[in-house]
């Protein structure tokens, strides 16, 4: 079996593996891309899964934080975030009350050039965009322990916000079952010890197929509880087809909409 891996921005590497060495395959299905994804986001925000329309969920004085992924993920933030900003403005929330926090986990900080490429010039000019800092305690808030003994410290900007929106992508994940949903918070905007211990605990599960591609598992349940405690109120998740084109948006309650997207 040939395995094609992305290498850099435009290249790929092909690995040939014997079929007997393939234990299982977790991949995205074939689905047609959306014809007008921007309009689909607007529709979904007007009728999110399990929630009232976004314009009814926020108040004009609210401090809103949008938590989005970094450039190691394919989520089209430059498409999604401008629509969110417009919807929040329509609800009375000015750009000055909105921040974007990039959920780096323990990844390196994105440069200004990379942020503009990922989020677009419009978003960069309209709102403050902050790289999550997993190392310095003054930028984190201790919110207690997860059930399996993991100390949880989250980004202070996120925790202190009145309304938190997570923007990510639903895809099979080896340690969480699926990426997306509350994973943008836990471990996305947690401290380095929280991130390390989360990966360590998940990596001890054997066989790997108990987690990867499984909707209901212990790690996902912890993710959901911590994300709720950190204040995640709404998710906008993409579902991409095998060509990385948007085939669906899962928008709404962080658990209900995530499950609908999976």
List the predicted regions and their residue ranges:
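Histidine-anchored nucleotide/phosphate-binding helix
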Residues: 73-93
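Acidic low-complexity segments
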Residues: 96-146
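Short N-terminal or domain-adjacent regulatory/targeting segments
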Residues: 31-58, 257-262
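N-terminal amphipathic/basic leader segments beginning at the initiator methionine
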Residues: 1-43
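Short glycine-rich or small-residue beta-strand-to-loop segments that form or flank ligand, phosphate
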Residues: 63-74, 99-105
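Glycine-rich phosphate/diphosphate-binding loops that line cofactor/substrate pockets in enzymes
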Residues: 49-65, 90-96, 230
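Conserved, well-structured core segments that form the ligand-binding/active-site neighborhood
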Residues: 126-146, 150-262
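"Short basic amphipathic alpha-helical interaction patches in structured regions
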Residues: 78-85, 114-118, 178-183
């Amino acid at each position: 079996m040939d395995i094609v891996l992305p290498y850099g921005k435009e290249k790929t590497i092909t690995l040939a593996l014997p079929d007997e060495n393939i234990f299982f395959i977790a991949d995205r299905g074939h689905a047609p891309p959306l014809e007008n994804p921007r309009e689909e986001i607007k529709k979904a925000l007007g009728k999110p899964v399990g929630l009232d329309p976004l314009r009814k969920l926020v108040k004009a004085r609210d401090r809103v934080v949008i938590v989005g992924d970094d450039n190691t993920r394919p989520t089209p933030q430059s498409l999604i975030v401008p629509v969110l900003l417009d919807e929040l403005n329509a609800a009375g929330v000015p750009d000055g009350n909105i921040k974007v926090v990039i959920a780096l986990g323990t990844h390196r900080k994105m440069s200004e050039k990379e942020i503009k490429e990922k989020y677009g010039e419009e978003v960069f000019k309209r709102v403050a965009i902050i790289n999550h800092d997993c190392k310095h305690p003054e930028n984190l808030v201790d919110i207690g322990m997860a059930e399996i003994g993991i100390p949880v410290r989250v980004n202070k900007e996120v925790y202190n916000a009145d309304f938190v929106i997570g923007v990510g992508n639903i895809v099979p994940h080896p340690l969480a079952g699926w990426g997306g949903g509350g994973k943008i918070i836990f471990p996305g905007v947690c401290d380095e010890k929280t991130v390390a211990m989360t990966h360590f605990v998940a990596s001890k599960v054997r066989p790997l197929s108990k987690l990867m591609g499984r909707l209901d598992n212990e790690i996902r349940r912890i993710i959901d509880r911590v994300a709720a405690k950190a204040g995640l109120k709404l998710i906008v998740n993409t579902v991409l087809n095998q060509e990385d084109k948007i085939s669906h948006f899962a928008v709404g309650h962080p658990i209900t909409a995530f499950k609908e997207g999976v």
